[in-house]
Amino acid sequence: MYIAGVMSGTSLDGIDVALVRIEGSGVESKVELIHFTTVPFCNDIKSEIQQALSIENSNVQLICSLNFKLGLCFANAVKEVCKEANFSLEQLDLIGSHGQTIYHQPKQDGNRIPSTLQIGEPAVIAYETNTTVISNFRTMDMAAGGQGAPLVPYSEVILYRDPSKNRLLQNIGGISNVTVIPNQQSDQNVIAFDTGPGNMIIDEVCQRLFQLSYDQNGEIAKQGRVVDEILTYCMSHPFLKMNPPKSTGREQFGEKFASELLKRFEKHSKENILTTVTMFTANSIVHHYKKFILPYYEIDEVILGGGGSYNSTLVEMLRNGLKDENCAIFIQEDIGYSSEAKEAIAFAILANETHHCNPSNVPSATGAKQSVVLGNITFPPV
């Protein structure tokens, strides 16, 4: 089957689309990446998404309209990846669309029950592409008592499980998450959970202090030094003390967190603040390894993915934090994969599993009561 996986993450970089060919289903699936592209959001759409993400500034009319606008954006992104690949849209069998997360409530909070909302109307995508769309992957896991995240572990087992090596797959997107993949001979469980911020706070600080959307290759962070009092403040966040399975998002590490941090520590230089929040991402990852993974698993390799793997300052901080742990550290490209395409490929794989009526959540990662088939299916008009 030819499937387009569509992902718009918490970093708001744009729409990632992976065109893949998949043979079979389940752990024996054969997955081939044909082409990958990122279609940037136009400024107006990005501004509307940012407004929709803000509890103070959002409204139901905006979210209702944006749901359909994003559906059209996602459809156009699918057309673009096919055009770039010189691939006929008519040959496409399926689209797996994650959607744009507007709010994610993984745990009960007063009268707010666990819930999640991703928008990007699948009916619009199906109509515009004349292709079956599978979307809303997180909701069934949450209905089964899970946190709806992380969902990539299933695809990571298919792509990365090794005959003899125990691997950690560390994604550094807006939020960071890790998947522990024991080797094929092991009887240990696959586990996965969010480790805290990825690029989200780094990008927010960059935008506010340097008027840049991100710190390219970590060049600015390389110029500063870590401020202990800021790092201590960051590392005291309650999320770091929680036991897995757990997930987090913009609600904990987004605009509000960055605003409070910058106000509290405004006396420090811009460069030092950026260096310190970069170290916070690295330290929060290392903290979770040492507390929840390394005491129980012997890890041979750590494989980094997501946009944060291109931040050489962040990667060097991670290497230093793990230098005594006797594990090799790679980025996706080192082993023949794409850091950028990883999550879009994952949702193509999940769409394929749903098409075959296979459960594809990992209860040991999400906390769900059982394995479930993920996603809603929207058929094209004819």
Swiss-Prot record:
Residues reported to bind ATP: 9-16
Record-linked InterPro entries: Anhydro_N_Ac-Mur_kinase, ATPase_NBD
SUPFAM superfamilies documented for this protein: Actin-like ATPase domain
E.C. designation(s): 2.7.1.170
The keyword Membrane is assigned to this record: no
GO biological process entries: 1,6-anhydro-N-acetyl-beta-muramic acid catabolic process; amino sugar metabolic process; peptidoglycan turnover
Family affiliation: Belongs to the anhydro-N-acetylmuramic acid kinase family.
Function text: Catalyzes the specific phosphorylation of 1,6-anhydro-N-acetylmuramic acid (anhMurNAc) with the simultaneous cleavage of the 1,6-anhydro ring, generating MurNAc-6-P. Is required for the utilization of anhMurNAc either imported from the medium or derived from its own cell wall murein, and thus plays a role in cell wall recycling.
Protein name: Anhydro-N-acetylmuramic acid kinase
Species, as recorded: Bacillus cereus (strain AH820)
